[in-house]
UniProtKB/Swiss-Prot annotation:
Its EC number is 5.3.1.9. It comes from Geobacter metallireducens (strain ATCC 53774 / DSM 7210 / GS-15). It is an enzyme of class 5 (isomerase). Pathway: Carbohydrate biosynthesis; gluconeogenesis; Carbohydrate degradation; glycolysis; D-glyceraldehyde 3-phosphate and glycerone phosphate from D-glucose: step 2/4. One of its GO terms (cellular component) is cytosol. This is Glucose-6-phosphate isomerase. Its main location: cytoplasm.
């Protein structure tokens, strides 16, 4: 297609909202002229289902709960006055608590002000807050955020080393809806131990974001933590960033949560439009459907040309893949849906995998994210009449053109700047697109049975570990994995036995010794003297 035809197609398919500055260009997606019209009936059905969801319908039937993350920025849309009041009260409490921390009326027991923030959470309880913190944070924020987002001991040690002697001025926020998530519990216990070793009383530094009556809620109440903020059962982890999960860490960091909520609210209004051509979330969902055949046939590569948006692809990985990656449709048919999401940032990726995107296997479509404003001030030229930001823009346009020359599809989202308002817009845009796409392909976007299966399997492994080590201690012998598995009456579990003991022997915690054999799997294990 020549440049004139491309320009005409660009003009025909460019979404632009003057109030927000949001733009969406779908012209480089190679859909046929009649595609949008052919999908209109399904799109209108998706709009209707979204309206029912926002009205309080049970959108997650296997869990019997509503899905109400849209109410978080428009409480007046909540199905009950009680929910609306709880949302408003929580946001106000967050503002007041953050102001008290910044003003010093809530401080460490010795009176020193809190200057660092440790957020303990995993999945949606970390990815959203991390994205917001990195996108909007500056060196002069009143609190500097750090994260325990895994149950990796070395990872937590590194974070504690970064905090260093400032632990006495560090406020810890533990985020878990149920309070039973093991990774978060482990992070909380590791943090508590670190405070204790420093001679500090952990409850006077701790805040909980959790469900009412949860295990974490009971712990925080009985121990006298500084504060507790709610997580409601109608907010899923991956869509919780505009709840206390994301707002409390952001407010403590000193970010403009009102601006973020306003941006999300504005985008929600845009994406409620029943006119498909004027609804950017619907256009996104339809482009996903076109690119993947509605069956996950292609991957989504997310390329934000802005360092502040580096973590957006990680955030979208969970939002999209955990929502859309489902074995069954809503009627119970096996469909194995999903869209794989990965990405880093431009123009870094010019020197990484863009080579394959242009010339390798064509199994993807690209989502470019463009930010018009380069920096807060003026830029000095790096060449006559050219700035570093001009180069960044040029690389985005050049990559888009180079991919198009090879028939590689892309769409481009443009925002005027990175700000609390535009970050809220991006979050809301993709939340809505995920929900609409799920309707188009007839799946439940709001549960995650595969995640639960993985948790149960991990629990089984840890239960076996206790039996394995107890058996070794009881026999006092040097045994192979096969011998231990047979003795436990589980000969088919020899691989689990071997891998469990391989890990145990590499660490001093369980007192296990390994005697390597020529064939590694024939190695013998025993208890250290």
């Amino acid at each position: 297609m020549d440049n004139t035809l491309l320009w005409n197609r660009y003009q025909s398919h460019l979404f632009h909202d003057p109030e927000s500055g949001l733009m969406l260009d779908i012209s480089r997606m190679n859909f046929a002229d009649g595609f949008l019209a052919s999908m209109e009936s399904a799109t209108q059905k998706a709009f209707a289902e979204m309206g029912e969801l926002e009205g309080g319908a049970i959108a997650n039937p296997d869990e019997g709960r509503m899905v109400g993350h849209y109410w978080l920025r428009s409480p007046d849309l909540s199905p009950t006055d009680e929910i609306a009041a709880e949302i408003g009260e929580t946001v106000q409490r967050i503002r007041e608590f953050a102001a008290a921390v910044h003003g010093g009326s809530i401080a460490a027991p010795d009176g020193r002000p809190f200057r660092k923030l440790l957020v303990v959470g995993i999945g949606g309880s970390a990815l959203g807050p991390q994205f917001v913190a990195d996108a909007l944070g500056d060196v002069d924020n009143p609190l500097t955020p750090h994260f325990f987002d895994n149950t990796d001991p070395d990872g937590m040690d590194r974070v504690l080393a970064q905090i260093g002697p400032d632990l006495a001025g560090t406020l810890t926020v533990v985020i878990s809806k149920s309070g039973g998530t093991k990774e978060t519990r482990n992070g909380m216990l590791e943090a508590e131990i670190a405070y204790r070793r420093a001679g500090l009383h952990f409850p006077r530094y701790a805040v909980a974001v959790t469900g009412e009556g949860s295990e974490l809620d009971r712990t925080a109440t009985s121990a006298g933590w500084l504060a507790r903020f709610p997580m409601w059962d109608w907010v899923g982890g991956r869509t919780s960033v505009t709840s206390a999960v994301g707002l409390l860490p952001a407010a403590l960091q000193g970010l403009d949560i009102a601006g973020m909520l306003e941006g999300a609210r504005l985008c929600d209004q845009l994406t409620r439009r029943p006119d498909t051509a004027r609804n950017p979330a619907a256009l996104l969902a339809l482009m996903w459907h076109h690119a993947t055949g509605g069956k996950g046939a292609r991957d989504m590569v997310v390329l934000p040309y802005k360092d502040r948006l580096l973590l957006f692809s990680r955030y979208l990985q969970q939002l999209i893949m955990e929502s859309i990656g489902k074995e069954l449709d809503r009627e119970g048919n096996v469909v194995c849906q999903g869209i794989s999401v990965y990405g880093n940032k431009g123009s870094t990726d010019q020197h990484a995998y863009v080579q394959q995107l242009r010339e390798g296997v064509n199994n993807f479509f690209v989502t470019f994210i463009e930010v018009l404003r380069d920096r807060r001030g003026a830029s000095l030229p790096v060449e006559p009449g050219v700035t570093s930001g001009d180069y960044l823009s040029g690389f985005l346009q050049g990559t888009r053109t180079a991919l198009g020359e090879k028939g590689r599809e892309s769409l481009t989202i443009t925002i005027p700047e990175v700000s609390p308002r535009t970050v809220g817009m991006l979050i809301a845009l993709f939340e809505r697109a995920v929900g609409l796409y799920a309707s188009l392909v007839n799946i439940n976007a709001y549960h995650q049975p595969g995640v639960e299966a993985g948790k149960k399997a991990a629990g089984t492994v840890l239960a076996h570990q206790a039996d394995i080590i107890a058996h070794l201690r009881g026999t006092g012998s040097s045994l192979t994995a096969d011998e231990i598995a047979a003795a436990l009456g589980r000969p088919d579990a020899a691989e689990t036995v071997f891998r469990t003991l391989l890990h145990a022997a590499a660490n001093p915690d369980h007192g296990i010794r390994m005697e390597p054999a020529e064939s590694l799997t024939a190695s013998r294990f025993s208890v250290r003297d």
